[in-house]
Amino acid sequence: MKSCALLLGVCVLLAGGCHQHPLTDYRPLDQAGMWSSGLEQLKKLDTSDSEVAQLVKAKQARLSDDTCVALVAAAHERKHPFVSGDATANLAGAGYSEAEILEIGRADQLDSISGDAVTLRLIGLSDNFVQIVLRRHLQGLRTLSSPEIARLKNTGLTEKQILERINSGMTDAQADHEIAVREATRNNSGTGFSRVRGRKPR
């Protein structure tokens, strides 16, 4: 009985020490251009097949092996698999650096803020403005959504004026109200009727 119990204990320890995904197929990443050193690091992180599929998207967006490995490690530190291949690729396509993408990943906000972050780039705002807004997102501070920022910009507000509103804690609802007022004022300006004076008939 003691020998059976000991054998059972050893089996449990071995099972606990084994990777949960020993049969993961890393060939898609190899084909996507990842070096063997990167693949070995992913094996140590017990990367799953689904994570490999997500990382292929990141590699296709030309992210380095080190960043890919770091993103998986960051996700595992948060106790979940890496599932943000699309968000990562979109951020890279919008011009965000690998350091910025990794910072967002370590904050566990790739999926939650990638849409807004990409839109900020598409609006045509300065790098400084984008960095300030992104920093507020990462710090959990109230920040206007990208669509509202774009609409405020279209009403003629400067980046400085928009930042003043963001720093004051303006909500999307408040921004929507100001946009409506500014658009109404703009549309009504110059629409008054003026009397046309013509030459009197002889």
Predicted regions and their residues:
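General marker for long, soluble alpha-helical cores
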Residues: 18-202
